A protein has these predicted regions:
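Histidine/acidic-residue-rich catalytic or RNA/ligand-binding cores of hydrolases
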Residues: 203-205, 248-253, 313-317, 358-368, ...
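Beta-strand-rich recognition/accessory modules
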Residues: 37-150
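Alpha-helix-loop-beta-strand connector modules within alpha/beta enzyme cores
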Residues: 219-234, 327-344
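Short acidic catalytic loops
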Residues: 1, 189-199, 238, 286-318, ...
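Active-site-proximal substrate-binding groove within the catalytic cores of carbohydrate-active enzymes
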Residues: 333-520, 526-541
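Short, small-residue-biased leader/transition segments that mark boundaries at the very start
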Residues: 2-9
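Conserved, mostly hydrophobic/aromatic
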Residues: 116, 229, 287, 306, ...
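Aromatic-lined carbohydrate-binding/catalytic grooves of carbohydrate-active enzymes
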Residues: 154-289, 302
Length: 545
């Protein structure tokens, strides 16, 4: 029998796996080949990405376990736009899996090839392993590292402070920024990213597009803030949503329609935004000039590039089909990024799409860091942290660490969320007392000690993938010498975690917090943990003989 799984994206609770038996999906392996009839089924089970948020419903990946052979198949479709994963019945009692980009049936995709022209579909990666989801996830992680653009950010795993989530929430001023920059430097962060709002004095949602500083927010200029970041030894970052212009943006209303995604003779509008069409070389040049200007004027070395609205099902302007316009847009966007990195090889670009709504390896082959969610609750964030290394490599998985209460276990839980991924620091740092700040500093310092092992290790999920109902969550990284394990107890005080090769374990210890503050032992091949309360988390180090 075969069990199929796919990754479901819920808004602000990304990376939640769903598991189905093949028979439940009406794809059973029974050979219906009676007298004079060669049996195969016509049923299929599909899931897909429908627009330009490639992962707003499902991630373009999946796992299939063959219980009869003990093999597991894992795959990903490397598309930033539309895609399709299809399971179906084949002859001889077999099942098939077909992976593709946009299709005519599901997406209305059509492309007319003229004589001498050729077409290549989006790439996909797949692996088959003996064993279950853990060796499969390890294999896909190694593959992702091989196909990714070599870059120093994913070698070093820089620690970034971002001023948005549970912090300034898009309302920056010079006064607010300077005090938070002090906190970021004190914590030991290496980059400081000024998020949304820096380009407009008021309600900015429908006015974005020119990316010029707001004088009301920064009376002495934005450069004063950037220079202060640099004076503290941090590198400067800015938020951009480069693929859009607001309907109230003065520049947008002076530009021709072919700069934008259009349908039925009009510009497509999504939530008071126009979508720039990167197939137009003038658009690409304008956006490149924006990036170069911000780098040259402010010393920016990091961009968080967001994508909060979509072009729906595409553009009918200068395209064989709306869906093909999406595909061509993304080909041009990927090339645009590659050209930027050729000229600015040390630049870091974070991939964001209202959190994880564009978390695909079309983008992540090129960009070094992924915003995994817009989730604002630290408890639900752990549900993402426990699973998301199945969707991205651990070092690319930007995980919010954003305490908003001055309480020790709250801070520890937040820090553990990020320790085996890429901790992405934010929160109400002005509320944190000395003890809470010290806990944050302790965690960031420890992360710098183990991040090379996070970079080289492979993920595993000793309890399987967590759900929103899980009382215990566990996620680990297995490195060459050591194994690290994050354990959360959102709904209980005791966790029982099976250990692989438990008889070979030489030592187990809690390494965050350093005082341990919990009980634990190895018993019957399990790590048994007694937490001091519900809603607690600890980071363990497991050393083998």
């Amino acid at each position: 029998g075969l069990v199929g799984s796919e990754m479901c994206i819920r808004d602000s609770c990304e990376a939640q796996w769903q598991k189905y038996d093949a028979e439940t999906l009406n794809l059973n392996g029974m050979v219906v080949d009676g007298f004079n009839h060669q049996g195969y089924g016509l049923n299929r089970y599909c899931y897909s990405g429908k627009g330009t948020w490639s992962t707003c419903e499902y991630l373009p990946m999946g796992i299939a376990e063959d219980r009869e052979t003990g093999e597991t198949y894992i795959f990903q479709i490397e598309s930033s736009g539309q895609w399709l994963a299809e399971y179906g019945s084949a002859q001889g009692g077999n099942l098939y899996l077909a992976l593709s980009g946009a299709t005519e049936q599901e997406h209305g995709w059509y492309k007319n090839l003229k004589p001498g022209e050729s077409f290549t579909t989006v790439p996909a990666g797949a692996a088959v392993v003996k064993g279950g989801p853990n060796p499969a996830a390890a294999a896909l992680t190694r593959y992702r590292r091989k196909v990714r653009r070599p870059n120093t950010d994913d070698e070093k795993l820089n620690v970034v402070f971002n001023d948005y989530m549970n912090c300034l929430m898009g309302d920056p001023t010079t006064e607010r920024e300077l005090s938070i920059i002090d906190k970021a430097a004190e914590l030991g962060c290496e980059y400081y990213c000024l998020d949304a709002g820096w380009y407009d004095d008021g309600f900015w949602w429908d006015r974005v597009g020119e990316w010029k500083e707001a004088s009301g927010r920064f009376p002495n200029g934005l450069k004063e803030v950037c220079d202060y970041v640099h004076s503290k030894g941090l590198k400067m970052g800015l938020w951009l949503e480069i693929e859009v212009m607001g309907v109230a943006c003065e520049l947008a209303n002076k530009l021709p329609d072919d700069w934008f995604v259009c349908r039925h003779g009009k510009r497509h509008i999504d939530n008071k935004r126009y979508m720039l069409d990167f197939r137009n070389p003038e658009v690409r040049k304008y956006c490149r000039d924006v990036v170069d200007r911000l780098i040259n004027d402010y010393g920016v070395e990091y961009f968080k590039v967001d994508y909060n609205v979509t072009m729906g099902y595409g553009s009918d302007l200068n395209s064989d089909s709306c869906a093909d316009a999406i595909r061509e847009h993304y080909e041009c966007l990927h090339q645009w990024y590659e050209e930027i990195f050729r000229d600015h090889p040390e630049l870091v670009v974070e991939n964001c799409g209202s959190g994880g709504q564009r978390m695909d390896y079309g983008m992540l082959k090129i960009l070094s860091l992924q915003s995994t969610s817009d989730q604002t609750d630290y408890l639900y964030n752990a549900n993402i942290a426990a699973n998301v290394a199945s969707a991205v490599t651990p070092e690319q998985g930007g995980m919010w660490v954003y305490p908003y209460e001055d309480e020790e276990e709250h801070v520890i839980y937040n820090v553990v969320n990020g320790m085996l991924l890429r901790p992405y620091i934010s929160g109400m740092v002005w509320k944190l007392g000395e003890n809470s700040m010290n806990r944050m500093k302790e965690g960031i310092s420890l992360y710098k000690e183990i991040r090379e092992e996070v970079r080289d290790g492979v993920p595993f999920f000793p309890l399987g993938f967590g759900t929103l109902k899980s009382e215990v969550l566990a996620y680990g990284v297995k490195a060459e010498k050591n194994t690290y394990l994050s354990v959360w107890t959102p709904g209980t005080t005791e966790a029982v975690i099976p250990l692989e090769n438990a008889e070979q374990v030489r030592r187990v210890s809690v390494i965050y917090p350093k005082e341990e503050m919990c009980g634990y032992k190895i018993e019957n091949g399990n790590l048994v943990v007694k937490m001091p309360q519900e809603k607690a988390a600890r980071l363990f180090k497991i050393e083998m003989k």
